[in-house]
Amino acid sequence: IKSNTGVDVPVVAVGKLGYPDIAEKAIRDGDCDMVMLARPLLADPDWCNKAFAGNVEEIRPCIGCQEGCVNEFILGGHPQCAVNPRTGFEERFPETFTPAEKKKNIAVVGGGPAGITFALIAAKRGHNVTLYEKSEKLGGKIAVGSIPKIKFDLRNYLAYLEKQVELCQEQYQLQVHKNTTVTAELLKEKAYDSVIFAYGTKEIFPPFEGREEANLILGTDLLEHPEKAEGANNIVIVGGGVVGCETAHWLANEYGKNVTVLEMLPHFMMGVCTANRGHLLHYLEKSGVRLYNCTKVKALAKDGVYVEQNQSQTVPDPYNTWQPLLPPNIPNPMEKAIKEEIVEKKIPADLIVLAMGGKADETFFFEAGEEHLAKEIYNIGDSSRAGRVLEAVRGAYHLAVRI
């Protein structure tokens, strides 16, 4: 194969080739001589052995978030992995789990990434584990977040988790109960030694003026029920975080909607890895999605959103894809002060989507403590602190290996 210089040299392909079928096709079709893997090996160091043996379903896939392998550098850390807590800590956490000193009956409330990760490890260590999920499907927020086509990496990770749960049920007698709402009465009746709460967040739903008359829906609800956007041509999304921006891309590209995203801060998707943030902003602009930063919602109406928008020339360009965003504790000497030129306006909307994030829901956790529903009670994942897959999986892993 010739390189783009026309010289006969080996060509190595790298980047988003972390699935054996894609990597093999690239070599077979003559697109490259070799495939180089980096992030996929952080997610699963045994990638090559599993692929060679044909155990593709057992490969833990990289989800492409770059939060552990890249963003941790910005925060002063070292390479990690959102889906593999051992990465970077191999000496601290052996590859083989240590059997539990005392076998316990454990209930896990919530089948998201934190709940599943804990349940798998605890069961493999010898505990009797029962995993409860209130919906018909495991995955929690990643089940919803993986709906857009661009989130195929997350869908593959969810499929991997489901496969691991299936194997754990067969080999380690993990019990799984879907469509089950856990109550204090149920926990009292079962008398578990330990209860692990991992049931996620409460959506933030501000008391905007006029919300009773507005055609309003939560972003997560819309992802699960896209039919609710039928007949809506102009859609306004309130919240310019990653959920709001990914939902905007989904609506514009998969349903052909006219979408506007409102963000009160100067930048969209604060805290997201610069590369991922930049790519999504680029495609939002390409898709015709309107991004309004420094824009504060004042009231909602049946046919639109009333806002106060800072239209000063000093407001950052929301489509600036490669502007590095430093952590809040690091001052940027190159950043210019933003002046205020506030203009009140109404943005037309047939449908208003709230994507303002969530907050930890600790209600049941504290109730369980007050009623002494188990000898040991723990709170992990988003129900402890709203975060990313990285924090959810890492926290669950750390608890599961020592309980």
Locations of regions flagged by a protein language model:
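Feature captures the FAD/FMN-dependent oxidoreductase FAD-binding
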Residues: 160-204, 298-308, 313, 353-355
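Flavin-dependent oxidoreductase catalytic cores
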Residues: 1-109, 113, 117-129, 137, ...
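A structural motif corresponding to the C-terminal end of an alpha-helix
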Residues: 1-10, 31, 164-176, 287-290, ...
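Local beta-strand N-terminus motif with an aromatic residue
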Residues: 32, 192-193, 349-350
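Internal, charge-rich low-complexity segments
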Residues: 289-293, 301-302, 306-328
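Rossmann-like dinucleotide/flavin-binding elements
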Residues: 27, 103-134, 177-188, 199-212, ...
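Residues at the C-terminal ends
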Residues: 3-6, 28, 124, 167, ...
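Rossmann-like dinucleotide-binding cores of NAD(P)H-dependent redox enzymes
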Residues: 128-175, 248-297, 384
